[in-house]
């Protein structure tokens, strides 16, 4: 993934990449294959590709369908984000921490259309920061919070000592 991410393009177009095992969640996934089978803006692959081909296909798409499998989380969700692409998945409370990430959440997969993808691109393309997915972002955030906590402690200790010294 690291090698492919270095050459990943971060431009968004209304194209969708689909690649997953139907058998992992047959009830939902079979319907999805049928839903997008004849859409010219959706590319469907079966999961027998090499890892390199699979990752390159993600790299060449803008949106990656990441339906629930054995659980609500999917490696596809995180691979898409890591490669600078937008995963599409259904709302679930476990994703509340992902609200600031470039993710297209739907209530039902039947909502997905080329128009929805175009609207997402137009309305949200500049409202997300891809930087939040980098190690440097989290390093800086933790370092800042650590420094802020030290400052807060020193201020509280000084105020406490000033209060105690009054008596």
Segments the model singles out, each with a brief description of its role:
Residues 1-105, 119, 123-167:
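Nucleotide-sugar donor-binding catalytic core of glycosyltransferases
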Residues 109-114:
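A short acidic, often aromatic-flanked loop/helix-cap motif at beta-alpha or helix-coil junctions
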């Amino acid at each position: 993934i690291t090698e492919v991410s270095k050459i990943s393009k971060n431009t968004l177009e209304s194209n969708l990449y689909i690649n997953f095992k139907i058998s992992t969640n047959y009830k939902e996934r079979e319907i999805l294959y049928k839903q997008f089978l004849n859409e010219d803006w959706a590319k469907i692959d079966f999961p027998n590709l090499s890892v390199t081909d699979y990752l390159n296909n993600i790299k060449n798409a803008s949106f990656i369908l990441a339906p629930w499998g054995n659980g609500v989380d999917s490696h596809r969700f995180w691979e898409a984000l890591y490669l600078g692409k937008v995963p599409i998945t259904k709302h679930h409370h476990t994703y509340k921490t992902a609200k600031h990430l470039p993710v297209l959440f739907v209530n039902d997969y039947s909502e997905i259309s080329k128009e929805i993808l175009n609207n997402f691109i137009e309305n949200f393309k500049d409202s997300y920061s891809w930087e939040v997915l980098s190690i440097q972002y989290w390093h800086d955030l933790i370092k800042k919070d650590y420094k802020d906590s030290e400052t807060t402690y020193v201020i509280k200790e000084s105020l406490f000592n000033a209060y105690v010294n009054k008596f």
